[in-house]
Amino acid sequence: MGLLVDGVWTDQWYDTSSTGGRFERSRAVFRNWLTADGSPGPTGRGGFAAEAGRYHLYVSLACPWAHRTLIVRALKGLNDLIPISVVHWYMGKDGWTFADGEGVIPDPNEGVEMLHQLYTRAEATYSGRVTVPVLWDKQTRTIVSNESSEIIRMFNSAFDGLGAREGNYYPAAMRSAIDAVNDVVYPTINNGVYRCGFATTQAAYEEALTPLFDSLDQLEQRLTAQRYLLGSELTEADVRLFTTLLRFDPVYVGHFKCNLRRIADYPALFAYTRDLYQHPGVAATVNLNHIKRHYYESHHTINPTGVVPVGPEIDYGAPHGREALSTMT
């Protein structure tokens, strides 16, 4: 884990000494928008029009934030329009790399061996963390965005005129409700597991753990009565929650000490996770080998031995029985 300082790579773990042991996530820096006609989006500059083959997505199969973009890319049928590169699961002194390994897809555009080199191609004096996903514009040789929550919204609509599959996962009539769910799920669950795992004081850890499980308890009740977070329709809110739920029992329970309860202990949440996993196109985006090996092998401050647990055994393909809930909401 490292960062760039004025374009120079530095191997440095998160500093929690000035935050009372609390992990504080840095904000994404590249916030341009890919739009159907190249007009500017809510942030950044314009000029990034949807075109087949112009853009490239860099991801880690381990990362829940990158996983969001892979799922929406699959749901919208964009696999042929937006090719991908996949970094190695191990994040060492050089950060994300394209070292040889199962599932790794090298960079065909700039030929970089380390992801931080792509960042400095886009901005030579860049300072900040080097994260995935990265949406790259091959035409202008720059990063369009490294903010996953915005990339999935670009994928949701920008390519609709170029043969994208039908489906709107952020419909106008539901946006306020989706945003309200995201505003709870992101800080307490998506980022909450990291706040637990990267905490360096007992107080900071417990401060994150309580709202995490309060939110999971509330979602268990919500999903007992309806198939998806917003009712009978799959939305981006479900995608954003799923990537954390999938990693919870294999990684976060043990590695991040999120062990009050497992997702398997929540009947509705566990069935919901299996339901989403079995949604067409989603299972192909999941690589549990990358997920487990990344966390347990890369985070030396948390797991210095690098030993990866063999379990747990989870059958995400088992029947979920949630189909009937679609007719009840």
Annotate each predicted stretch with a short phrase.
Residues M1-T329:
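C-terminal alpha-helical interaction module
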